[in-house]
């Protein structure tokens, strides 16, 4: 049973890491969402009567404009000739730059509401979470939307009642193994049906033909094809060609139906697609999307005075046409202007004047209204901050030049322009754009106003956890006497006063609930540290007993060096390979001279070092899967033969069943992969077999074993290894199963080497070996993830393996399967650490507890390495670094419980062999 202190440690650790995992989103990536602003109309005279927004989900800018070699037909041609023809003759075009996360919800919110949701928005789901702020659709007369059930409902349900109509297909349509074109065909088919229905419904015709309407076509086909077959596949290219053909037909039908030229068209995408069929991170292939606008109110293409070439667009053959890039949120302002609607009150988009066909004074007025709408947000946000601060420091830029002065100068210029001083128009536009930029910077200033205060709290929380958890480690595993700690009156006074004062500050600042939790943990931790300072002092002395001061300095320096090296390894995985090769000499350095075992350790270390040199983003390889699976089976059989004297008939039967499950899973995986690669869909029998084997191997087989468990630690490790092998195989894309095999072998060899070193070392009063084991264990904890991936690929997992079980899109179950695959190496490591506790004759969980108490050194590093500026790829990597560091600690806490179960009653001595006869 766990002691009271250990139970508190586990519960506090889990809660602490869960809340602090979220802290970066509350501190660094908070959207400046405010309510209560008044509306600002974009323009008095709408250039267009209606607008069509066509969004190709997952469509890359380069694919839209490049000349492409089709992988099947061999044709070398443009995929979207009609769109290109518009760019050359009718439209204004550019690249729309999205922000991270490059997912569908944030992308659509940016272009339709003009608002960048915070990074955590990707966790909000889809139709279950309608947007809780104003949008362009909400400002339209009426919006008719067609497409995916993942996107349409969040704008329909979040808008004014009866403002948005939606025609959606069912989720069963989103089958990654079927033709993605059918998803887009549904959209075009239903909008044409809507037009046809007006022939027998005059009320509908009147409604559809009223000014200010919006038609939203969400085309999911490219995203589906990209996920299934990659953006360089025939399926993806054919989907782009289909969209181009249908857009041409749509334009013809729209002109025919409305019988005028007063329609504006916007063609764009919510995000791009990586070369490996994923999106979510800040890679340029994910953040660069096409933007083509034509029709009423839109400029014709502008010729460059001299062709402009760059590496990205060199194959577009559009160097003579001016390219006008925008930020994704700018699209909302453009669309609002085109139909004369109010700017969405939360929009931070800037009206892209290069797209507009209008006199300069009209452009200026529309831009000025845009600036006033953004300024309105700043003023409302500022009042919120003033009301929640004891002392308010005004935004520096508006101290130098007050916003009232900006408004007066711009209004004065507009009046002079109206009187005929047209030469002032460029100055007025420049000043208006400056006001918008300063205001947006001011919004960022207000959003981060309390950064220093809350970051100090979080820092004290991390430091408090590190010291508190280390004191728990000392109390439970180092000190051999009880301490009756009681809080003194001084403790109650100091921390009671701090609790009241700081909580009142948060209350006065109208802080969210999470902020109170960020404060709660450091107060609790430091109160306990202050109370148990004698435990900490005595424990450190005992822990380092027998180690001289110079050696202590060297030891601490070495620990810091290793941990900081791992910080750098998060950015460059090859550092893991370097450390593995250095560890190959670890037994020799420690005086272990078994050359056979040392040679095997050296070979295994060299093998495992290879994985962090391989590309973290993988391409499906059935050959690698089969070879690795064969090696897993051979390793299991070898282990079975080696341990056969330790097995009774019951355990032997369990082993045979587990090996058979591995073989059956290989067969099911092969059938699934071959069928999916041949574009014939997922065979039902292979899908059912995959699920059955996965459930049986993960749940049923462990239960069967624990009915009559074999308590030999080697047998138990082999049982655990085989338990997860089928799951790892079906979720493997290429070399991951190799890693699973080598990683498991490395841990087993490490256990044996450490136990031999323990036998060679006389009993001493210090804990050198424990420190060494903890450092290596912490290193392996990080490698459990980096062996098969990196932080830049966390949001870019290929879904190839998941299709073998779930061909129809369902993000949360798919994500759950990927998480299971991720945590399996952690479970293997946790079991290995548990066995090491036994082999080294130390208390259960000693090693893992010391790892947990030091691992947040990484978390604190990455908390301050977070970036909020620069490329979205860099920002995304820093977010992922922090999350992975926190989750590593959290995994160790949770997996302690798992290890407690899987290693129940494990013994180092040989078990009594039962009769070979069955009952």
Curated annotation (Swiss-Prot):
| Keyword Transferase included in the entry's annotation | yes
Name the top EC class.
transferase
Annotated Gene Ontology cellular components are: endoplasmic reticulum membrane
Positions on the Cytoplasmic side per record topology: 1-8, 478-487, 532-558, 620, 675-686, 740-773, 837-845, 904-919
> What is this protein's function?
Ethanolamine phosphate transferase involved in glycosylphosphatidylinositol-anchor biosynthesis. Transfers ethanolamine phosphate to the first alpha-1,4-linked mannose of the glycosylphosphatidylinositol precursor of GPI-anchor.
CDD domains in the record: GPI_EPT_1 (cd16020)
The name this protein goes by in its record: GPI ethanolamine phosphate transferase 1
Q: Which InterPro entries match?
A: Alkaline_phosphatase_core_sf, GPI_EtnP_transferase_1, GPI_EtnP_transferase_1_C, PIGN_N, Sulfatase_N
Instruction: Give TM regions.
Output: 9-29, 457-477, 488-508, 511-531, 559-579, 599-619, 621-641, 654-674, 687-707, 719-739, 774-794, 816-836, 846-866, 883-903
Q: Which organism is it from?
A: Kluyveromyces lactis (strain ATCC 8585 / CBS 2359 / DSM 70799 / NBRC 1267 / NRRL Y-1140 / WM37) (Yeast)
> How does this protein lie in the membrane?
Multi-pass membrane protein
Q: Name one GO molecular function term.
A: mannose-ethanolamine phosphotransferase activity
Query: Where would you find this protein in the cell?
Result: Endoplasmic reticulum membrane
Any Pfam family the entry gives: Sulfatase
Lumenal topological domain ranges are 30-456, 509-510, 580-598, 642-653, 708-718, 795-815, 867-882
One of its GO biological process terms is: cell wall organization
Record carries keyword GTP-binding: no
* Keywords assigned by UniProt, alphabetized: Cell wall biogenesis/degradation, Endoplasmic reticulum, Glycoprotein, GPI-anchor biosynthesis, Membrane, Transferase, Transmembrane, Transmembrane helix
Protein family per UniProt:
Belongs to the PIGG/PIGN/PIGO family. PIGN subfamily.
Identify the EC number(s).
2.-.-.-
Quote the pathway field: Glycolipid biosynthesis; glycosylphosphatidylinositol-anchor biosynthesis
Which residues of this chain are annotated as glycosylation sites?
A: 138, 196, 201, 285, 311
């Amino acid at each position: 049973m766990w002691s009271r202190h250990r139970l508190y440690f586990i519960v506090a650790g889990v809660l602490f890491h869960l809340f602090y995992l979220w802290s970066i989103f509350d501190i660094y990536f908070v959207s400046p969402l405010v309510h209560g602003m008044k509306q600002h109309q974009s323009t008095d005279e709408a250039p267009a009567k209606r607008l069509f927004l066509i969004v190709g989900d997952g469509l890359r800018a380069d694919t839209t404009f490049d000349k492409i070699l089709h992988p099947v037909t061999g044709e070398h041609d443009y995929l979207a000739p009609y769109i290109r023809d518009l760019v050359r003759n009718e439209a204004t075009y550019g690249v729309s730059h999205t922000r991270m996360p490059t997912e569908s919800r944030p992308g659509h919110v940016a272009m339709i509401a003009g608002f960048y949701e915070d990074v955590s928005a990707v966790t909000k789901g889809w139709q279950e979470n309608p947007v809780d702020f104003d949008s362009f659709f909400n400002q339209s007369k009426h919006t008719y939307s067609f497409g995916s059930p993942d996107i349409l409902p969040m704008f329909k349900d979040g808008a004014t009642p009866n403002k948005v109509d939606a025609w959606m297909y069912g989720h069963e349509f989103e089958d990654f193994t079927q033709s993605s074109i059918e998803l887009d065909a549904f959209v075009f088919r239903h909008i044409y049906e809507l037009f046809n229905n007006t022939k027998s419904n005059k009320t509908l015709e009147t409604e559809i033909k009223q000014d200010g309407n919006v038609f939203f076509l969400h085309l999911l086909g490219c995203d589906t094809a990209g996920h299934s077959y990659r953006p360089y596949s025939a399926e993806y290219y054919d989907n782009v060609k289909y969209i181009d053909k249908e857009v041409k037909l749509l334009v013809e039908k729209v002109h025919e139906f409305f019988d005028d030229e007063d329609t504006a068209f916007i063609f764009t995408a919510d995000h791009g697609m990586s070369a490996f069929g994923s999106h979510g991170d800040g890679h340029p292939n994910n953040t660069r999307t096409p933007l083509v606008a034509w029709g009423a109110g839109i400029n014709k293409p502008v010729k460059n005075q001299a062709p402009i070439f760059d590496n990205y667009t060199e194959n577009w053959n559009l160097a003579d046409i001016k390219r006008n890039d925008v930020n994704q949120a700018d699209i909302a302002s453009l669309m609002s202007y085109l139909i004369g609607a109010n700017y969405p009150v939360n929009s931070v988009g800037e009206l892209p004047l290069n797209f507009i066909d209008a006199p300069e004074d009209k452009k200026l007025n529309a831009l000025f209204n845009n600036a006033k709408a953004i300024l309105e947000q700043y003023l409302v946000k500022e009042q919120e901050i003033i009301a929640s601060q004891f002392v308010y420091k005004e935004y520096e830029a508006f101290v130098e030049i007050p916003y009232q002065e900006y408004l007066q100068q711009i209004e004065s210029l507009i009046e002079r322009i109206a009187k005929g001083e047209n030469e002032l128009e460029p100055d007025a536009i420049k000043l208006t754009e400056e006001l918008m930029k300063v205001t947006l910077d001011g919004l960022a200033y207000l959003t981060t106003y309390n950064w220093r205060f809350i970051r100090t709290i979080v820092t004290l929380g991390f430091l408090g956890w590190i010291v508190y958890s280390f004191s728990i480690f000392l109390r439970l595993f180092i000190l051999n006497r009880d301490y009756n700690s009681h809080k003194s009156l001084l403790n109650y006074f100091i921390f009671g006063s701090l609790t009241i004062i700081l909580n009142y500050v948060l209350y006065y600042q109208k802080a969210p609930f999470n902020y109170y939790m960020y404060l709660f943990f450091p107060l609790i931790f430091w109160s306990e540290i202050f109370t148990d300072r004698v435990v900490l002092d005595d424990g450190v002395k005992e822990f380092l007993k027998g180690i001289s001061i110079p050696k202590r300095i060297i030891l601490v320096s070495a620990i810091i060096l290793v941990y900081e090296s791992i910080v750098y390894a998060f950015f460059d995985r090859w550092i893991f390979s370097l450390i593995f090769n250095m560890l190959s000499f670890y037994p020799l350095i420690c005086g272990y001279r078994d050359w056979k075992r040392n040679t095997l350790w050296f070979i295994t270390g060299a093998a495992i070092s290879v994985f962090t040199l391989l590309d973290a983003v993988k391409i499906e390889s059935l050959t690698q899967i089969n070879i690795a699976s064969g090696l897993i089976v051979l390793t299991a059989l070898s282990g079975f033969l080696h341990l056969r004297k330790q097995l009774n008939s019951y355990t032997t039967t369990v082993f045979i069943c587990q090996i058979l499950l591995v073989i059956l899973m290989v067969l099911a995986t092969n059938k699934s992969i071959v069928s999916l690669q041949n574009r014939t869909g997922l065979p039902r029998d292979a899908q059912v077999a995959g699920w059955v084997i996965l459930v049986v191997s993960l749940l049923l087989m462990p239960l069967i074993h624990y009915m009559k468990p074999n308590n030999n630690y080697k047998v138990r490790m082999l049982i655990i290894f085989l338990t997860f092998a089928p799951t790892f195989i079906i979720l493997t894309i290429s070399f991951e199963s190799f890693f699973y095999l080598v990683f498991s072998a490395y841990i087993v060899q490490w256990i044996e080497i450490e136990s031999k070193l323990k036998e060679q070392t006389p009993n001493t009063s210090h804990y050198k070996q424990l420190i060494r084991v903890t450092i290596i264990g912490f290193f392996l904890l990080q490698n459990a993830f980096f062996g098969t991936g990196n932080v830049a690929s966390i949001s870019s997992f290929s879904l190839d393996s998941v299709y073998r079980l779930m061909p129809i899109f369902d993000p949360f179950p798919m994500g759950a399967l990927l998480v299971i695959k991720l945590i399996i190496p952690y479970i293997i490591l946790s079991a290995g650490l548990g066995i090491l506790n036994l082999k080294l004759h130390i208390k259960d969980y000693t090693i893992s507890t010391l790892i947990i108490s030091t691992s947040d050194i990484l978390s604190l590093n990455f908390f301050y390495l977070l970036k909020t500026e620069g490329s979205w790829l860099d920002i995304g990597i820093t977010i992922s670094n922090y999350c992975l560091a926190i989750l590593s600690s959290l995994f160790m806490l949770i997996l302690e419980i798992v290890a407690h179960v899987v290693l129940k009653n494990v013994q180092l001595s040989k078990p009594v062999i039962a009769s070979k006869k069955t009952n």
